């Protein structure tokens, strides 16, 4: 269960206050909700912002920090995807594009993303799940690594 947003905000805000800065509650809440309260991703972004900014007042600052994080991880992601089949990589990008996919083997999803047939998607999905790159939630399939998800959306 994620930390309560207001408690987490107070914790992060305290660090910015200690160095004479400020963290906008609205901006923090956007980060919190974008990453579903997942501490690791939020902390990574907060650390980057703390290193580079005194006051956080707009989402554009967060976007710059996120871009920097993604660029730093790009070699890792590029190295990883070279081991995927074309079908696996296409499915990863399709799931990232849709954020969450309830029926990855549906004709609509396959056609919309120009994927191979349902059996190919099913086989690719199994491999991606086994490698813990795709995760099935109660709502549907998502890219497990939220930073990889953002990177896939950009390519």
Question: What residue ranges belong to the model's regions?
Answer:
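A short helix-turn-beta junction within AAA+ P-loop NTPase domains corresponding to the substrate/partner-engaging
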Residues: 1-2
């Amino acid at each position: 269960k994620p930390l309560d947003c207001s408690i987490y905000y107070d914790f992060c805000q305290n660090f910015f206050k200690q160095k004479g800065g400020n963290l906008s509650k609205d901006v923090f809440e956007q980060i919190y909700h974008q990453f579903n309260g997942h501490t690791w991703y939020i902390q990574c972004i907060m650390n980057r912002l703390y290193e580079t900014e005194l006051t956080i007042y707009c989402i554009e600052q967060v976007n710059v920090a996120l871009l920097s994080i993604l660029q730093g991880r790009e070699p890792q992601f590029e190295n990883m995807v070279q081991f995927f089949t074309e079908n696996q990589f296409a499915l990863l990008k399709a799931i990232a594009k849709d954020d969450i996919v309830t029926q990855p083997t549906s004709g609509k999803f396959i056609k919309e993303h120009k994927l191979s047939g349902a059996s190919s998607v099913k086989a690719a999905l199994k491999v991606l799940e086994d490698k813990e790159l795709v995760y099935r939630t109660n709502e549907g399939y998502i890219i497990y690594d939220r930073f990889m998800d953002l990177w896939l959306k950009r390519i």
